[in-house]
């Protein structure tokens, strides 16, 4: 966290091999470990929550049903009736990102959503799916979208490359949005936590001054809980929007 008077706020994002020599040879770091943990937690939540409904649902089952209905309604309302076919994908995507965001807030954990390689891979998955669905639903008419309707044909050499570039930038913007928000939040938490420890090492006067950063860190933690859920929602709703455009004829 801090060495002497230096605060290393970016050290938390460094990848280190786990499982000793085996992990080093396989390039198996804490990032895939936390992805596996996130996947297991989501599956466990669904398994426990989606068991045959009791007469009086427990809290976990009630929470699972609320989450199910929320994502289902979002998919159908945004995409249309075709959204039911994409519901499992959107549901999995939302909770995988949400679990990754929240796991990163635990002590000695790792936020895999704070790595651009992970968020870009998720964004490319969404992008490729949207392109495949577009080609299947629209056929050759899909390429007509790169020429704005009503625009003069003479402007095609200028407008078509711009539209293609805008379309290809979707996975980049989608991945950077999640990555940047997670990095910014964790850097702020690390800085104020390190600042608190540095002040606490100054004796009684430092302990009094450290109250301020502690309060700020608690507020930041609450904010990160909100941001973690919000970013998972934004990623999911943008996925729905891209798929809505893909299925539109």
From Swiss-Prot:
Annotated TM spans: 30-50, 86-106, 115-135, 142-162, 191-211, 218-238
CDD domains tied to this protein: ATP-synt_Fo_a_6
Annotated localization: Cell inner membrane
InterPro entries: ATP_synth_F0_asu (IPR000568), ATP_synth_F0_asu_AS (IPR023011), ATP_synth_F0_asu_bact/mt (IPR045083), F0_ATP_A_sf (IPR035908)
Topology relative to the membrane: Multi-pass membrane protein
Keywords: ATP synthesis, Cell inner membrane, Cell membrane, CF(0), Hydrogen ion transport, Ion transport, Membrane, Transmembrane, Transmembrane helix, Transport
Keyword Transmembrane helix part of the UniProt annotation: yes
Assembly, per entry: F-type ATPases have 2 components, CF(1) - the catalytic core - and CF(0) - the membrane proton channel. CF(1) has five subunits: alpha(3), beta(3), gamma(1), delta(1), epsilon(1). CF(0) has three main subunits: a(1), b(2) and c(9-12). The alpha and beta chains form an alternating ring which encloses part of the gamma chain. CF(1) is attached to CF(0) by a central stalk formed by the gamma and epsilon chains, while a peripheral stalk is formed by the delta and b chains.
Protein function: Key component of the proton channel; it plays a direct role in the translocation of protons across the membrane.
Stated family: Belongs to the ATPase A chain family.
Protein name, entry field: ATP synthase subunit a
Native source species: Gluconacetobacter diazotrophicus (strain ATCC 49037 / DSM 5601 / CCUG 37298 / CIP 103539 / LMG 7603 / PAl5)
């Amino acid at each position: 966290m801090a060495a002497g008077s230096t605060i290393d706020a970016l050290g938390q994002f460094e990848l280190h091999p786990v499982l000793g020599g085996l992990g080093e040879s396989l390039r198996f770091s804490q990032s895939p470990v936390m992805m596996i943990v996130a996947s297991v937690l989501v599956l466990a939540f669904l398994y426990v929550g989606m068991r045959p409904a009791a007469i009086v649902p427990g809290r976990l089952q009630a929470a699972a049903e609320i989450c199910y209905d929320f994502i289902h309604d979002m998919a159908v309302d945004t995409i249309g009736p075709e959204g039911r076919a994409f519901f499992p994908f959107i549901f999995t995507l939302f909770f995988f990102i949400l679990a990754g965001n929240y796991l990163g807030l635990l002590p000695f954990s790792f936020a895999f959503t704070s790595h651009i390689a992970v968020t870009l891979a998720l964004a490319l998955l969404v992008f490729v799916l949207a392109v495949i669905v577009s080609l299947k639903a629209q056929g050759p008419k899909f390429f007509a979208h790169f020429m704005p309707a009503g625009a003069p044909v003479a402007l095609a050499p200028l407008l078509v490359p711009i539209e293609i570039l805008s379309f290809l930038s979707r996975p980049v913007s989608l991945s950077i949005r999640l990555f940047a928000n997670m990095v910014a939040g964790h850097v702020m938490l690390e800085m104020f936590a390190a600042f608190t420890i540095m002040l606490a090492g100054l004796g009684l006067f430092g302990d009094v001054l450290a109250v301020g950063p502690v309060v700020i860190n608690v507020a930041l933690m609450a904010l990160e809980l909100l941001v973690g859920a919000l970013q998972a929602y934004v990623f999911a709703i943008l996925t729905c929007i891209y798929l809505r455009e893909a299925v539109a004829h």
